[in-house]
Amino acid sequence: MRFDVLTLFPDMFPGYLSQSLLNKAIEQQLVEVAVHDIRRWAKDKHQSVDDRPFGGGPGMVIKVEPVVECIEDVVPLDARPATVALMTPQGRRLDQTIVEELAQ
């Protein structure tokens, strides 16, 4: 099973991946994990990946373009069929049942 993690904070993952139960699965070659920095797909010189919300309001949102381009580049890296899961506040809660469905 392969996981490609798309993130703005790739430096957060090596410690976790090398110390957890996931590390044992990686060492036993049951799982592969690749971490991808979404900023690599940003188009401007500052590698900006966030923007103000459409229609105004407080806070920032992640631009869709770098995320889509990253997905389009990462999915073909593995010949196996891919399931793409995008995490959003409005989505379904990722629970054990969903994880088991995705593992099939």
Residues of each region from the PLM?
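S-adenosyl-L-methionine/SAH cofactor-binding core of RNA-modifying enzymes
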Residues: 63-104
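N-terminal nucleotide/polyanion-binding subdomain common to many enzyme families
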Residues: 1-77
